[in-house]
Amino acid sequence: MRTATITEFSSSYRSLPGLLHLLQFGDSALPIGGFSFSNGLESAIQQNLVHDKETLREFTLTAMNQAATSDRIALLTAHRAARADDRGALQVIDKAVFERKLNEETRLMTVRMGRKLCELSASIIDDRLNRDWLECIKTAETPGTHPVSLGLAFAALDVDGRDAFGAQQYGVATTILGAALRLMRVSFMDTQKILLEATSTVAPAYEEIADAGIEDMASFAPMVDILAAVHVKGHVRMFMN
């Protein structure tokens, strides 16, 4: 039986805290309000665009692709700016994210979750930049979007950009699939099968945008904006978007 060397144990222990931080801040149960949002699924079901496991699969993969080319680019650029302590760049990124949210509900979602996350980070992480960023949000110097707050938190915790990207793409999928279990007739087996396929798209998606700048951030999803507009006027709503 092979015995692990001291070097291997040391390497494992060095990486373990980062892994645990990733799990904590990538958890859908993190108390920042993510469970209140369905990423557009509720309206998609009400409009019969999603009605079975196959249309749910298509919706989930589309949402992940949209997130990869928009909020995830913001996450990575904010992560790099935070590591460089470039506060001017952080404000530019934050405003760019907010301006690209075309409807009321997605704007509400990103700033509400962003502020809650920054309040949490500033309270439990010993990092001056996170505390200063919270003050900027409170004084309305910056919108305080979720991707930027997350980039700051992961930078302070020394989680690398690739892992941060992966955690958040996983979060998009689990948010949608968790909402699906409450909104439509679909089994846990079905959602887990979709999740397994969805996670296989994360690494290729990262490679495509790893070096992207904020000017590359874009998404073309007119149906999502239409569904959000419909949802605002909905009379029966389980989720906030």
Swiss-Prot record:
Major subcellular site: cytoplasm
Pfam families cross-referenced by the UniProt entry: UreF
Lineage: superkingdom: Bacteria
UniProt subcellular location: Cytoplasm
Keywords, ordered alphabetically: Chaperone, Cytoplasm, Nickel insertion
UniProt xrefs under Gene3D superfamilies: Urease accessory protein UreF (1.10.4190.10)
GO cellular component: cytoplasm
Subunit structure: UreD, UreF and UreG form a complex that acts as a GTP-hydrolysis-dependent molecular chaperone, activating the urease apoprotein by helping to assemble the nickel containing metallocenter of UreC. The UreE protein probably delivers the nickel.
Task performed by this protein: Required for maturation of urease via the functional incorporation of the urease nickel metallocenter.
Similarity comment: Belongs to the UreF family.
Protein name, as recorded: Urease accessory protein UreF 1
Gene expressing this chain: ureF1
